[in-house]
Amino acid sequence: MQKPDLSVEIAGITLRNPVMTASGTFGYGEEFSEYVNLEAIGAIITKGLSLKPKAGNPTPRIVETTGGMLNAIGLQNVGIDAFVEKKVPFLRTVATPVIVNFFGNTLEEYAELAERLDLIPEVAAVEINISCPNVKHGGIVFGTDPKAAYSVVKAVREATIKPVIVKLSPNVTDIVEMAWACADAEADALSLINTLTGMAIDLDKRRPILANVTGGLSGPAVKPIALRMVWQVARAVKIPVIGIGGIMTGIDALEFMLAGATAVQVGTANFLDPGAAGRIAAEMERYLADNGIADVKEMIGALEV
């Protein structure tokens, strides 16, 4: 039997395999290039980008938990100007599609970032982080209100011709309602889930461990929730879904594809093993070969319910 075909397509972009690196866990790609074969990865998703540099939250801002980790990094990043000057030159040398994750605090910030990124040919697509407060409307998080989510996706859609992926927050009552709002605003794909809000407490000090008090929970602990949400959303929308949440092995990734994901993102696993994304792709290939499956696309949405 020939080697299985691992290629998939997201919004017109062909990926050599379905495994992407999740934003915030792989820097801007260059940081991992000495340790990882970037061409073993389907796509690189950069650390979240904002208009101005962001210092992030005070420490401590990471804590291990049972089956995962909490992070309160605070979206620390270099800002769009330094990204263009210092990060893009390296991206020109990479043969793997680069997707830039970005965020804002107003519709205008989202639109301006989309316009700036639209001018960079090395950027294959954008991923919008909508888990941010809208400072002009009482601080409500864009990603927890369908109307706000629609507005921000629409603003980005009108500002760029690049494919637009929207990263959905799981901290909502109805993830499908959020997915519909983003699809109606002409998103090209949806990625989910972002982290779940959690906290950790130091019993002896009687204080939160994280300086920010709360943080985002990721890792294997969130996988069952992520699988359920991916399954719900994939059945509800006609655009591709990218699965995220506790993917540590090729088996995990293929489970997300059965639930309806066209591709997956690997996040927390990168902290444990910088080569996790490439390893997971290889494990997927091995499973397909061992089970006589010629094309990974046969797995997408093949869950029997």
From Swiss-Prot:
Instruction: Specify which residues bind substrate according to the UniProt entry for this protein.
Output: K47, N71, A72, I73, G74, L75, N129, N194, T195
* Cellular localization per UniProt: Cytoplasm
State how it assembles. Answer: Heterotetramer of 2 PyrK and 2 PyrD type B subunits.
Q: In which pathway does it act?
A: Pyrimidine metabolism; UMP biosynthesis via de novo pathway; orotate from (S)-dihydroorotate (NAD(+) route): step 1/1
Q: Signal peptide span per the entry?
A: none
- A Pfam family hit: DHO_dh
Recorded family membership:
Belongs to the dihydroorotate dehydrogenase family. Type 1 subfamily.
Paste the cofactor note: Binds 1 FMN per subunit.
Alphabetically ordered keywords of this record: Cytoplasm, Flavoprotein, FMN, NAD, Oxidoreductase, Pyrimidine biosynthesis
- In the UniProt entry, which residues are flagged as the active site? C132
Cofactor requirement: FMN
Q: Its GO CC terms?
A: cytoplasm
Give the highest taxon in the source lineage: Bacteria
Enzyme's top EC category: oxidoreductase
* NCBIfam families on file: PRK07259.1 (NF005574), pyrD_sub1_fam (TIGR01037)
Protein source organism: Geobacter sulfurreducens (strain ATCC 51573 / DSM 12127 / PCA)
Instruction: List the GO biological process terms.
Output: 'de novo' pyrimidine nucleobase biosynthetic process; 'de novo' UMP biosynthetic process
Reaction(s) catalysed by this chain's protein:
(S)-dihydroorotate + NAD(+) = orotate + NADH + H(+)
Q: What is its EC number?
A: 1.3.1.14
Instruction: Check the record and name the InterPro entries matching this protein.
Output: Aldolase_TIM, DHO_dehydrogenase, DHOD_1B, Dihydroorotate_DH_1, Dihydroorotate_DH_1_2, Dihydroorotate_DH_cat, Dihydroorotate_DH_CS, Dihydroorotate_DH_I
Q: State the protein's purpose.
A: Catalyzes the conversion of dihydroorotate to orotate with NAD(+) as electron acceptor.
**Listed GO molecular functions?**
dihydroorotate dehydrogenase (NAD+) activity; dihydroorotate dehydrogenase activity
HAMAP family per UniProt: DHO_dh_type1
Q: Quick one: which residues bind FMN?
A: S23, K47, G48, N101, N129, K167, I193, G219, G245, G246, G267, T268
The protein, known as: Dihydroorotate dehydrogenase B (NAD(+)), catalytic subunit
